[in-house]
Amino acid sequence: RDCMEPSTASYVHQALKLSPATQIFDLSNACLGVLNAMLVGASMIEAGTAQNVLIVSGENGRTLLDNTIKRLNEDLTLDRQTIKPFFANLTIGSGAVAILLRHAKQVSEPKPLLLGGIVQTDSQANHLCEGGTSHNGLFMQTDAPSLLEAGIGLSQKAWKNFKHEMAWNESTPSHIITHQVGHQHQIKLYEALHLNIRKDVSTFKDLGNTGSVALPISL
């Protein structure tokens, strides 16, 4: 977020000149923010409290990238080990997306449908990637090997539950989009889930890791 107050949603509302009756709020959850917003929006539509839900997200990697490069150039105490937590910062990209959700009954033309899903959480791994602001600006440090291992383990549990919930199997999806982290993550994930990597749709080679917008921007 560019600032603590007001909400980012208020700037979007003003720029688009939306109705005063429009409910606005920010929903933030690192790289899962857009997916969480889609589930919240879908629940509001199903409950009848909203007819149309506009989800907007933007990721600006420039500040983090610039601060990381500055620190790496200035901190002469860094060695081969202490520099590793900063590597992930150099893969960060920028992007923006907007998603409009509405009930399938309101759509006249064929559109992508949100069919369902499951939730799987491992908050014990929340220390493996931490970032924020300080007097030195925006910063982030990542234990990439441990985060990869924890993420693969969590994805295996999630995929097992998803297949049961949706009555899917490994051959059901025609296209597959994973979180856009990097090539090593991509290979290990497909191997762990026994999925066909030829169905993969990736953007990280061109856009980098675009965080919360990675999935929708790859669509």
Language model features: what each stretch is:
Residues Q23-D26, A50-G58, L113-Q120, S171-I177, ...:
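Beta-strand segments within the central parallel beta-sheet cores of soluble alpha/beta enzyme folds
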Residues T49-I69, D122-L128, H183:
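Acyl-CoA/ACP chain-elongation machinery
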Residues R1-D2, P6, S19, L27-E46, ...:
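Claisen-condensing/thiolase-fold acyl-transfer catalytic domains that form or cleave C-C bonds
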Residues Q23-L27, K84-F87, T142-S146, V201-G208:
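A short glycine/serine-rich beta->alpha loop
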Residues S19-Q23, A47-V53, F86-F87, G95-A96, ...:
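Short coil/turn connectors at secondary-structure junctions
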Residues D75-E149, K157-K160:
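Condensing-enzyme catalytic core mediating Claisen C-C bond formation in acyl metabolism
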Residues G33-M38, E59, A98-L100:
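Alpha-helical metal-binding/catalytic segments enriched in His/Glu/Asp
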Residues C3-L18, L64-L78, L128-T133, H185-I197:
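Acidic-glycine-rich active-site phosphate/pyrophosphate-binding loop
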